[in-house]
Amino acid sequence: MRLIATLLATCILISTGNLGAEPVRAAYPSANVQFLPAFVALEKGFYKREGLDAELVSVRNAVTAVQALLGNQIHFIFSVGPQMPSIWEGSDIILLAQQVGRPTFSMIVTPDIQRVSDLKGKKIGVSFGGSTFAGTKALLELNKISDKDVQYISIPGSTPKIAAMQQGIIQAALLAPPSDYIAIKAGFRRLVNLADIFKDTSFSGLAATGKTIKEQPQFVKRMVRAVVRGVIHTRDNPQDAIQVMVRHWRMERDVAVDAYQLVRESLNPVPTEKGVELMAQWQAIALNTKPKRPVKEYMDLRFVNEVVAELGQK
């Protein structure tokens, strides 16, 4: 637990700095467009409005994030899929709301690859156990391409994947904004955007432990409300959302615009059971297993439904 605390202490990205407010810590894997609503909520003061002093913590390792959540080192996580294997084994983690309801990844390939079937015999960069591996396998399975038809190369991180493509080590990789656009500017091409294929897949959200939900329901609802406001504002105010990416993530404006356009239609604070099931299938495919629990056992949409109704949203 001391190691987890040390990791978290070195990973805090940004906070509201709201003196007198109730501290809240929420973890996300990386500065990715799928977590944009959480950052918009920070920028627009939605956490402050709820009396919360929010710290958004970057924890790249899903296992570490889950351990930190279960150990009360953090209060919430913004991911949906990475914690599922732990949930299937009995971890008390509950999905409360959604930020992005479609995968944000694009399959980026060398110019010679024109169709998904052309991936046969190619080397694909992946991060084993992560969402890129799950998404890659889901795409290949949908197109009836088996693992034997491709070669997976373990390359964690987007920038190293792009470098590996430039060096000819791999010919394809699943990349999220802004890395996909950066790769395209470097001469590669977007073969397919997974959001166009998997149109209801709960990709990022808000989750907490059942213990926290039971013992601090109003605290949880305030956090849900802040995130829901972030999702709605991100969807309805493109320029604000783009400016957050430029300011906080140091994106070039054209990169931020491309990233926003890819994600805008998938901004929805209320997950569907089907969407969570599809994400569970992604995780199961990546681990070569099957989901061990029905998703309704680890979803609690009471707060998000109440908040959406209170805010007058459909």
Positions of the model-derived regions?
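Secondary-structure end/capping motifs
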Residues: 214-291
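Sec/Tat signal peptide C-region and signal peptidase I cleavage site
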Residues: 17-21
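Conserved C-terminal helix/tail region of periplasmic/extracytoplasmic solute-binding proteins
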Residues: 284-314
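Bacterial N-terminal signal peptides
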Residues: 5-15
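Short amphipathic alpha-helical segments at helix boundaries and their inter-helical linkers
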Residues: 74-77, 166, 170, 262-279, ...
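Short, glycine-/small- and polar/acidic-enriched structural segments
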Residues: 22-167, 171-177, 190-196, 200
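Pocket-lining segment of extracytoplasmic ligand-binding domains
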Residues: 81-82, 152-153, 159-248
